[in-house]
A protein has these predicted regions:
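Glycosyltransferase catalytic domains, chiefly GT-A lineage
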Residues: 1-155
């Protein structure tokens, strides 16, 4: 069983994005899966979506993604996270072939050669990451060091 996750925090996206993501995964994943949404919203999600409530925390925007790396956040197994604005058009079974003991992220190839040692050649832009977190792949309980490090040093 694989774990599919998303985060629905705040009001940038409404709950229809969560339900739409669930439908795209259902259509394009042949593996058995559980779909989890880490949420602080009271939207009426699809009945097959398991809600993990965001308890009172000080995390904002994308920082809530880090909570997924807590110990026992979801049952054991592979975890695949998608941002709510991701569009899935084809089968995604093969993504799990990239599963390792580390976190797997998408290379931000679209940043191209404008990246030079973390600085963009374009004025007033800064690129300090060569990866994108709109899709993340990891084994549950194998990347707890990410959450633990963040808890020790949130800045």
């Amino acid at each position: 069983m694989v774990n599919i996750l998303c985060v629905h925090w705040g009001n940038k996206y409404n709950g229809t994005y969560v339900n739409r993501l669930y439908r795209m995964v259902s259509k394009n994943l042949n593996l058995p899966f559980n779909f989890y949404c880490y949420s602080n919203n009271n939207f009426e999600y699809n009945k097959n979506i398991k809600i993990i409530p965001i308890t009172s925390n000080d995390l904002e925007i994308y920082w809530n993604k880090l909570a997924m790396f807590q110990k026992d956040f979801v049952p054991p197994g592979p975890c695949l996270f998608f941002d709510l604005d991701v569009v899935i058009q084809k089968n995604i079974d093969h993504i799990f072939n990239y599963l390792s003991s580390n976190l797997t992220m998408i290379k931000a190839h679209w940043k191209g050669d404008i990246i030079t040692y973390g600085e963009s050649r374009k004025r007033k832009e800064r690129w300090d990451m060569y990866v994108n977190s709109s899709m993340l792949l990891w084994q549950s309980n194998k990347c707890t060091n990410i959450w633990e490090h963040f808890q020790k040093d949130p800045d």
